[in-house]
Amino acid sequence: MGNLRILISLTTNDNDYQVEQANAAEQAAQKHGIDLKIIYSDNDAINQSTQILKVIQEVEEADRPNAIIFEPVGGTALPQVARAAVNQGIAWVVLNREATYVPELRGLGKAPVFIVTVDHIEIGRIQAEQCAALLPRGGAVLYMQGPSENSAAKDRAKGMLEKKPANLHLINLKGQWTEESAQRAVRSWLKLTTTRKTVIDLVAAQDDAMAIGIRKAFQEVPNEVERERWLS
């Protein structure tokens, strides 16, 4: 019997969290003698679906993985792709996302199917409590969310809105979990006429990379007085 073959599909290779997941997987694979392949979908749900299906549909069984572990890019956890994998006897693991089809696919009894995730709503609540502690008298929070179609981003925003006090006002921007995407979003926001009179008391982001991107965008402001106003 040969080594287990595992395919991991991650969203992007320019996000610290995704890179750390890849590093952890490589270390575990080396430790346990697993043949590991990692692919990235460049934050494109169609690309991710196509990449995984191509592997599932390999003619030779030896070219197919024994298991697929993936973090979904889009709003769904690729139910049709999941079914195709399980029908081929390939184990299916969803990272950081709920997937309502899991009980049904488990019932087929053809391959293991499960989810590894965290409580994203609770993460949003905790962040709301942190913001409230930092701004006990209230204020304006520049809040950088993940992609609109991403359920983790939606759940974190839901938790934030549930728990934040009424005296905290959120100014919402959208990113793609990366420094560059957050930087672009803030650059565009700073160009708006309405932004000139805006006062920000706190910056909050749904991941560390986007928080860094926000700061970098403020550091680019050419006017020293304005730059210090945003950074102070």
Where are these regions (language model features)?
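A residue-level marker of the well-folded mature domains of exported/periplasmic proteins
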Residues: 1-232
